[in-house]
Amino acid sequence: MDVAKQFSSYLKQENKTENTVQGYTSGIRQYIKWFEGSYDRKLTKLYRQNILEYISYLKNVKMLNAKSINHKISSLAKFNEFLIQKGSQQDQVILKTDMIKVQTVYASPTQIVELDVKKFLQSVLEDNNKRNYAIATLLAYTGVRISEALSIKMNDFNLQTGECIIRSGKGGKQRIVLLNSKVLSAIKDYLIDRKTYSTAHESPYLFISKKREKLDRTVVNRIFKSYSNVITPHQLRHFFCTNAIEKGFSIHEVANQAGHSNIHTTLLYTNPNQLQLKNKMELL
């Protein structure tokens, strides 16, 4: 087993989310590719000088933004911890000061409006795929993350009470989200279709495919792209937060539904987005 796969197994043993495992493992594979391409040798441990050179490469050659670089540094820090536990390394060579300081952006991350979402949902509806419509409606009107939606099991939701348990929330936290009539109707329609899937009897998951017992997020991203170049699963989450606040939800109500551990994250949705800020600048 190569070291990246070993690292992936290590993360899973720590009960990291599927998203975190994929993101960190991808970051390490990229570093290994850069290291072996630069020095023509196999990676056995991390060296401080190499880390500094890699960060410089990400900044000046790849021209990545601070957020992307910081994510790769976080991956390397976790990988460093893994190598120490494995006995391949003794020292921690990634420091907290390696992280690039970023000024907090106070603009709302929402880039789409209600009309955009309605048009998108109508396109999915007219395509007559009940599963895809149920997923899109769930994301737009509950604010759950795509990873959370795809981890919902058949015994996690109650169509009578309109409640769903999110067991795989960020940081391993559980919460109950409320399902409105639009979501309930879409799920009920899909459940009839779900019975025709060959994997329906074996799979405990709500969202399945014809071949797999659990729908993959890359498949969902591809489905969304076939309908829109702008609307993504994550944009629907942003839309929910902004839409809920505009419809009268309190900050704490939105935070509970969306699973925000920090209330300041929710507060961002009370602010204008980048385009609105630019338009305001033109008024000066």
UniProtKB/Swiss-Prot annotation:
GO terms for biological process? DNA integration; DNA recombination
Q: State the organism of origin.
A: Bacillus thuringiensis
One short Pfam family name for this protein? Phage_integrase
- Give the source's domain of life in one word: Bacteria
The keyword DNA-binding is assigned to this record: yes
Q: Which PANTHER family match?
A: PHAGE INTEGRASE-RELATED (PTHR30349), TYROSINE RECOMBINASE XERC (PTHR30349:SF81)
An example of a GO molecular function for this protein is: DNA binding
Keyword Aminoacyl-tRNA synthetase appears in the UniProt entry:
no
Q: What is the lineage of its organism?
A: Bacteria, Bacillati, Bacillota, Bacilli, Bacillales
* Reported function: Resolvase catalyzes the resolution (a site-specific recombination) of the cointegrated replicon to yield the final transposition products.
Entries under InterPro entries matching the protein? CB (IPR044068), DNA_brk_join_enz (IPR011010), Integrase-like_cat_sf (IPR013762), Integrase_catalytic (IPR002104), Integrase_recombinase_N (IPR010998), Integrase_SAM-like_N (IPR004107), Tyrosine_recombinase_XerCD (IPR050090)
Q: What is this protein called?
A: TnP I resolvase
